[in-house]
Amino acid sequence: MLLFTGAACGSGGDGSSGPAVVDLSEASGAAGVRGVSLGAPVAKPATTLVDTAGAPFDLRTDQATAGRVTLVFFGFTNCPDICPTTMADLDAALESLPAADRDRIRVVFVSTDPDRDTGPVIRRWLDQFDASFIGLTGTWPHIKEFADALDVAIEPAVREADGTVNVTHSAQVTAFSPDGTARVAYLTGTSVADYAHDLPLLARGET
């Protein structure tokens, strides 16, 4: 099933935006949580990306994410709307939780604009929201492979004649449980209260 849940964000020009597509096959409401249930469980991608310090990062084995709830979002730092809104909402939701719950959850931002989003650029941008947020980048083929493993639709950046750079990406947040499997995702319209309700349940493996 194709869901229009993202935006083709523009930067460097008039900042125009339009719809993007994310494929959530057989998505439906998930029992007990406010996210949507994925049609089939999704394993963490085997593709290794690069963190903001330039070190290889494997979502499956890195000590920052192994055994923790891991929320993965694809976007870019020049995004004028959905990316900063999503990061701010996740930060607000985490801030509302007890410290013990927060420590069991990690947010991972994967850049879909690797030519402009260098490690330091991503790090400065994420630090506006939460210094614990993990930023990843890499070559476009590796980023696309990573996204494809999650059934998340992204497209390479396109520079228009007027200098505007359009980057089409999904608004989906994929939630991996501590066992390394994603069964739930969050789409446009998810509120801070929705995240705050679900994250402790995910951390306890109650999905």
Where do the language-model regions lie?
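Structural microenvironment flanking redox-active thiols in thiol-disulfide oxidoreductases
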Residues: 85-146
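Short, ordered coil/turn segments that flank beta-strands lining enzyme active or ligand-binding pockets
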Residues: 52-53, 178
